[in-house]
Regions:
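Basic, polar low-complexity surface loops/patches
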Residues: 1-85
Length: 85
């Protein structure tokens, strides 16, 4: 749940920016950002009672960043509660 809390913290400050949170060897994103990942990469969405989540292996991050940049979608990557744009 810490990943989701980190996501919400950064998303509240950056409404129009996708937020990815590193969790172990995966990156996760939540809620409406999941729909973008579904459209671009066909990643499955897991629906929970209060939120939705999708994730991908950390070794795919360069592919994801390249596609988001190509589509002119802003994003933030959060690792260890430190973010990079």
């Amino acid at each position: 749940m810490a990943s989701y809390n980190d996501y919400k913290e950064y998303k509240n400050k950056n409404h129009e920016t996708m937020v990815f949170v590193k969790s172990g060897v995966f990156y996760e994103t939540y809620d409406n950002d999941c729909k973008i990942m579904l459209d671009l990469f066909d990643y499955q969405i897991k629906n929970f009672k209060n939120f939705s989540r999708t994730g991908f292996p950390a070794n795919n991050i360069d592919k994801v960043k390249e596609k988001l940049t190509e589509k002119q979608i802003n994003y933030i990557i959060v690792e260890n509660n430190i973010y990079q744009i």
